[in-house]
Amino acid sequence: MGISSSAPWLKYYDSTPAHLDYPKKTVYEMVRAAADKYPKNIAYEFMGKKTTFAEFMERIDRTAKAFLAMGIGRGDRVTICMPNCPQALDSFYALNRIGAVSNMILPLSAASEIKFYLDFSKSRAILTLDQFYGKVASVLPELENK
């Protein structure tokens, strides 16, 4: 079976390669490499505040140390229930740095959906903001994997 029959959309690709060879690195390692190369460049801007790669790496490293101090480590699953904000980014990359597995869910999910996601992922911990804590806390006693 040729590429055209298994992926017919490829015939519409002009100069776009059908396959990319990605480096064998974690997403944390990729961001770290960018930070090492461009420490003063802006990593992201949130609500008008610009954060450089150097600052971003400091935040990630501090967050990773905090996770380790809480006993979260390699292979642990952690749900991030936050909007798109710096704390979500810090947590995502910090968890990747220590070898934990993060899964991100929408904080506007219904309580029943949050329970489903936590049970399905077998998360060891969940991270959220105070605005969403009540909804998250309401499902904790019902979880299969406590």
In which residue ranges do the predicted regions lie?
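Flexible, non-catalytic linker and terminal segments flanking ANL/adenylate-forming cores
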Residues: M1-K24
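A short, compositionally biased
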Residues: S5, A35-K40
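Generic secondary-structure boundary/loop-capping signal
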Residues: L10, P86, N103-I105
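A broad detector of the eukaryotic-type serine/threonine protein kinase catalytic domain
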Residues: P17, A43, K49, A100, ...
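Conserved AMP-binding/adenylate-forming core of the ANL superfamily
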Residues: D21-P23, M30-R32, K40-C85, L89-Y93, ...
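Conserved, well-structured beta-alpha core segment at the onset of a catalytic domain
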Residues: V27, E45, I126-T128
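Structural core segment of the AMP-binding/adenylate-forming
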Residues: M70, R97-K146
